[in-house]
Amino acid sequence: MTDSQMADFGAAAEYLRKSEKERLEAQTRPFDIRTECFVPDDKEEFVKAKIVSREGGKVTAETENGKTVTVKEDQVMQQNPPKFDKIEDMAMLTFLHEPAVLYNLKERYAAWMIYTYSGLFCVTVNPYKWLPVYNAEVVAAYRGKKRSEAPAHIFSISDNAYQYMLTDRENQSILITGESGAGKTVNTKRVIQYFASIAAIGDRSKKDNPNANKGTLEDQIIQANPALEAFGNAKTVRNDNSSRFGKFIRIHFGATGKLASADIETYLLEKSRVIFQLKAERNYHIFYQILSNKKPELLDMLLVTNNPYDYAFVSQGEVSVASIDDSEELLATDSAFDVLGFTAEEKAGVYKLTGAIMHYGNMKFKQKQREEQAEPDGTEDADKSAYLMGLNSADLLKGLCHPRVKVGNEYVTKGQSVQQVYYSIGALGKSVYEKMFNWMVTRINATLETKQPRQYFIGVLDIAGFEIFDFNSFEQLCINFTNEKLQQFFNHHMFVLEQEEYKKEGIEWEFIDFGMDLQACIDLIEKPMGIMSILEEECMFPKATDMTFKAKLYDNHLGKSNNFQKPRNVKGKQEAHFSLVHYAGTVDYNILGWLEKNKDPLNETVVGLYQKSSLKLMATLFSTYASADAGDSGKGKGGKKKGSSFQTVSALHRENLNKLMTNLRTTHPHFVRCIIPNERKAPGVMDNPLVMHQLRCNGVLEGIRICRKGFPNRILYGDFRQRYRILNPAAIPEGQFIDSRKGAEKLLSSLDIDHNQYKFGHTKVFFKAGLLGLLEEMRDERLSRIITRIQAQARGQLMRIEFKKMVERRDALLVIQWNIRAFMGVKNWPWMKLYFKIKPLLKSAETEKEMANMKEEFGRVKESLEKSEARRKELEEKMVSLLQEKNDLQFQVQAEQDNLNDAEERCDQLIKNKIQLEAKVKEMTERLEDEEEMNAELTSKKRKLEDECSELKKDIDDLELTLAKVEKEKHATENKVKNLTEEMAGLDEIIAKLTKEKKALQEAHQQALDDLQAEEDKVNTLTKSKVKLEQQVDDLEGSLEQEKKVRMDLERAKRKLEGDLNVTQESIMDLENDKLQLEEKLKKKEFDISQQNSKIEDEQALALQLQKKLKENQARIEELEEELEAERTARAKVEKLRSDLTRELEEISERLEEAGGATSVQIEMNKKREAEFQKMRRDLEEATLQHEATAAALRKKHADSVAELGEQIDNLQRVKQKLEKEKSEFKLELDDVTSNMEQIIKAKANLEKVSRTLEDQANEYRVKLEESQRSLNDFTTQRAKLQTENGELARQLEEKEALISQLTRGKLSYTQQMEDLKRQLEEEGKAKNALAHALQSARHDCDLLREQYEEEMEAKAELQRVLSKANSEVAQWRTKYETDAIQRTEELEEAKKKLAQRLQDAEEAVEAVNAKCSSLEKTKHRLQNEIEDLMVDVERSNAAAAALDKKQRNFDKILAEWKQKYEESQSELESSQKEARSLSTELFKLKNAYEESLEHLETFKRENKNLQEEISDLTEQLGEGGKNVHELEKVRKQLEVEKMELQSALEEAEASLEHEEGKILRAQLEFNQIKAEIERKLAEKDEEMEQAKRNHLRVVDSLQTSLDAETRSRNEALRVKKKMEGDLNEMEIQLSQANRIASEAQKHLKNAQAHLKDTQLQLDDALHANDDLKENIAIVERRNTLLQAELEELRAVVEQTERSRKLAEQELIETSERVQLLHSQNTSLINQKKKMEADLTQLQTEVEEAVQECRNAEEKAKKAITDAAMMAEELKKEQDTSAHLERMKKNMEQTIKDLQHRLDEAEQIALKGGKKQLQKLEARVRELENELEAEQKRNAESVKGMRKSERRIKELTYQTEEDKKNLVRLQDLVDKLQLKVKAYKRQAEEAEEQANTNLSKFRKVQHELDEAEERADIAESQVNKLRAKSRDIGAKQKMHDEE
């Protein structure tokens, strides 16, 4: 809104919105979005700062105060651009977070703008001073404005609610919440003031309001506030006028929006304030108003003084308030009573009860001498209070001091102590005040209840907000529970609106119901077995205390609900007993006094006096209270309530809250959140921490959180294109037309931003949070670049202009200089001098001629001037006239514009009316269809009823007999019900016993698990338990010494007591008793010590067993170490031999190169080499023999792997024999064919290929052998597993059979009970069938009536057809008229366009446009008048609605066309005005054309008149048609009245019949439900038993599988070890490679151990889940002996797994460090066992930690074993590759031998063959060298194979990650099982509740059966009446048809 529009708000404008100047200044303020930020602050929550630097996740910033702070990067929050300063709707902030919201509120509050929107919220801050924003001028300015059209205000919220109610036909509500002192009451008053002012402008008379003795309804609604505030408001620390109750005010409106009535509901009145106030607070205002002495007659009537300090109940705090004038407030309260219609008697009663409460507080009592009973200490105040209450003073005192109490069936008088009497007085005073306040509310509602018709309402909820105090009690729980429900309601509503916005805009969005976020907390409070339920249950038990209530809360919710927590008590604060996690924060609650507060007990003797009071008001207040004797019968029969007195406070609050939520769910809500800025009541000061606390509590930040989930920023396409086109102008070209949406899409797609951060709707573009700020930053950067460029170009242009001027000056100076120099050169010439003299003479003659010419010219100019002056005057006159005409035309255009605006508004209203009518038409059609269906049903039922009418008369006698039988059966069923209740009570007791047994079994099971874990801990807790046990032993020794000292002290005390025996006998007795007790304690201690000693001896024996096992393991380890040493030495030897061989090969190659020299030397060297080679071969054979010896020794130890290795050796030998045969063949070929050496080489190459293939085949055979061996091992393990499983399952089968026998016995008893109940239900069903038969006969009569009604409806349809024909004729006339008018107006438009082209002048165009607009306006007015008439017809006639709807759409199109044409004419007007300015000089020439145009205009006016005459004729014809319509309408109205009467009568009869039928059906359904529920409950019990059995079996199976896994892993480890020992021979040759593999394996082992640490947490969670599953075993396990047996088995399993774990770790790590560590751990365990004389309680606490560590170690061992198996497989693969390489090496060695042999032969041949042969040998040597290189390449390939194995290890790590995922899946499965367990528990609870409800329903049904007969008689009489009435109506209808 502009400043001119804001002027409508008057003086309030500056307090509502920033001016345009301020907005411009804010937008031009320098701002850097990258550095401006908020940082957290200890005092101020957040402060503004500028970022100085960033490094390492830390940000250094400088605050506004100059302070430098360093914070984490995620704690820094960006500031919003200046565009968003003091923004009205905080949801539009681009950076929407806590500091942005806080500072926006703070800056607006500093400018006194106290109202701010936050999405759906309106946040208001208390200004603590008067602001001119509520006067009548502001009310008028806000009326009818949309929320976006006006500044934020409570009036805007109110008006929107009012407008929504009128347009949407939906009830509205305004929810105002906040802390005390935040301004809730003031805003509530303003809302009511607004509604009273805008909705009551019409009729202010009192004729429709008979209850209004004084004042109108509006006055009464406004005056209800002062009356309620006097009795419900009080001064508190924060607020002088704090409402101490919540209220929901419903203001009802009629169909037109006028006030109709109002009513008020109140919640949670603070009763305790009546008798107690804090120092800085005071009681309710009414007490001090009475004592203000403004009305002395009141003081005399109430027998009080004017000094508040005379009365204890009202003087505990302050007695006066500076801001409140109690005397004036008394007059306002009294006048409010008068306006609200209170009688004098009612006013006096209210005042008397208020005075009596003050006297109550002054009553004194004292204790009787030598008794604890109380007696009155003076009766003056008691007499006064009794007089004012209309009681007898003596009876009152007697009732207080000696109330009557019922004991059994008799009443006894009970004596009260002084404290009990004072408590009783306080409770009575509070109860009287509360009931009086509730009566006032009821009385005010009766006054505000008028007889005016009401259709909709607007509810205003004023209730306390969320409360988190240091001390939170029952009241805070109720308030916070209420706010939790309201916040859930808001969350759900808010996101529903967001979703509707997204759906309307066509944005894809997945629905999220944020309303469910708070469901867990709400369920915790209100659901069965919730906090409220447990509180009410405890109130039922006489011996219940606050601590038992706390224990039940802990048992049911601690650890089971995340919202229920154990509080952390802080020193200096009051104790808290439990904590609840609400949406606004965690609240600690103190439960002291909750049971008394909830029960709110009263002295029933005094209440009985109240009921008999002579004061009418007092007797009325307590008339509904049921005392003990009145409620006795209800108790005995188990009724629902013990009257109203037994209804607890929590139950009443829940009931009221459910009603409120039901009301709110039927309304469209609006939310107002009030904020208190500071606690000092200082205006303009805002305390940041206080405000942040409230924003969290009242849901503003919660609302922002929800808003941020979607797209909080949204801009219209046009606005976005206009503002951000500058970012990329090329995306939207200037010259061509592009739709705004397409332009926005192109623009955003061209920018470098995340496309998921925005969405395109139908009319708007939606942005995620923060993106708009990024766009603003990009726009600012773009603008700065553009402005910089413009500035540069402008400066350049200016400088170029200046430079051009300088150049021109220089050129001019040069010309002047040249001319002066030329003149100076010729001025002394004689001819020049002569020229100077003659020149003036020549000029004088010329001047004379010029003067004559000038005189002539002057005369001519003078004449022309005179003519021009005359012409100018004429033109001026014409200009004045034209200007006048122009102004007139402008005024006319403005008037036409206003008229057009009015027409548009009326058109909008018509469109709205059309929509409403369409809705009504739909409703009427639906109603018509329903009525037709009902009519059909009624006619059919009518026929049936006529047929059955005769049968009914016969059945009446039968019914009387059946009724007598039913009465007998009723008595029988009552007896059965009693028996059933007794049986149910017995069942409840059985269930309670079962639950106790269940708990006992759970505890026993838990104890057994603890024992099991303790036993496991004794093995696995190493260093930690050692230290702790040593400390415990020291503590025990210290405690033993202390016990000895205590014993010595006691003996000394005993001797001293014996010496003092003569002093006093009483002290001796006491001391002897003490001595006896101490001796008993000592005996107990000694007994405990002996027990612990026996336990220690057992533990020592166990430790000895463990020590033996450790020694065996150590011996085994030593053997393995010796074997390892032997392997290492063998490997060292082989490595040495290999190095020697390689060295020798190198020497051979060198010698072969030198073979070209002397052959004799070479022969000698060859011989030496051969000798050395022989020696090396012998050494190698010896080494192989040694290795074979060691391998044989190992094979003897491990017989399983001998066969496998033997087969492998056989295969290798076969391959070797083949190779040797081939070698011999090669030798023969070499001897035979020495000349063909090349062919031999080729043959050799081929044979080598063959050998390689054979070797591959051999490898394949070996792999197959390994697989078969592996499968054989698997079969053996499976066999062992199946044997163990069979044994275990046999044992479990025996246990389960015993268990099943127990369950079957229980099931038989339950089935017997169920059969009894079934028999009872069948008897009841027979009675029901008899009644159902009677009901069917009544239905037959009803069907006959419905047939009659159908005939009436057919007649009605006939009339409607006649009416529709008339309406169709009207529609034809209207369409004819509209088409003619459209054609004529189009002709006018064409003619005026031709006129405009001919005139080409602005004034003519203006006149043409004006004429056009006037004609359009006239025709439009006529059409609108006709439309209004037709709309009235439409409202009267439902049948013609469809036709009128089509015509209305046509009219809308025509109106849109005219509107478009008018806009075109406006554009033509603007263009013509521009032309008028440029062509004003040509007006004179165009005068003739103007006159011709006037003639044309007159012709068009004549045509217009003809058209108007035709229109008038048509309107007359329409008027005649309308008369006919009116006559038909009258007939239709009469018929409708008769139809409505008949329909209402039929509906009443049908309703009564349906009601009776429903009652009987409900009774039958309830009986069936009871039967089904009992059967379902029994089935569920059976299912629970079966489920528990299955769970137990599942747990046993899981234990068995874990045991099998352990055995498999152990066998696998042993098998791997055997294979490793068997493969040692092959690994000896490749020792270096094996060492490298071993080092890599160690690295992978370390990685696996690190991975084990990572997965340890997940395994812990899985173990916890397993523990939860194990608890289910306790449901079916009845004996502790079974658990002990399982304990023994599990111990054995643990010992086995422990041994396997140690073996696996020892085999994997392969170092002696682990052995030494285990040795030290075992020795420490031996020491620990000796010192296990610890206290049992301390030992149990430490056992839990140790058990956890044991589980971790066990899981770690399992993981390590599996990793070891995987690593062993990998190692086996590497060993296979190394074996392959070894075989290749052997082959190479064999080829070397062959080559050596050939070399020897070659040398011999060389001796014979000479140099040629030597050259051949050299060539052969070169080929061998090439082969050697090839072998080296193969070696490199083997290295590559090793790298592949490394990649395989990486794949194994990936498999471990998959194992992690499997663990996660297991965890999910465990969670699901836990949820199922909880669901089963919940079902059991619901079954118990259902049983209780079924019993109550059973009792209800009996009562309803008694009422069924009476209702059947009533229905029959109504049917007879309806028959007579329908006959009369049929006769009337026939008469009407004949007329």
Swiss-Prot record:
Residues 657-679, 759-773 are annotated as: Actin-binding. Residues 842-1939 form a coiled coil. It is found in: Cytoplasm, Myofibril. Disulfide bonds: none annotated. Residues 1925-1939 have a biased composition (Basic and acidic residues). GO terms for cellular component: myofibril; myosin filament; myosin II complex. Its main location: cytoplasm. The modification Phosphoserine is found at S417, S1090, S1139, S1271, S1309, S1512. The modification Phosphotyrosine is found at Y1261, Y1310. The modification N6,N6,N6-trimethyllysine is found at K129. It comes from the Eukaryota. Residues 783-812 form the IQ domain. Muscle myosin is a hexameric protein that consists of 2 heavy chain subunits (MHC), 2 alkali light chain subunits (MLC) and 2 regulatory light chain subunits (MLC-2). The cardiac alpha isoform is a 'fast' ATPase myosin, while the beta isoform is a 'slow' ATPase. PANTHER family: MYOSIN HEAVY CHAIN, NON-MUSCLE, MYOSIN-6. This is Myosin-6. It comes from Mesocricetus auratus (Golden hamster).
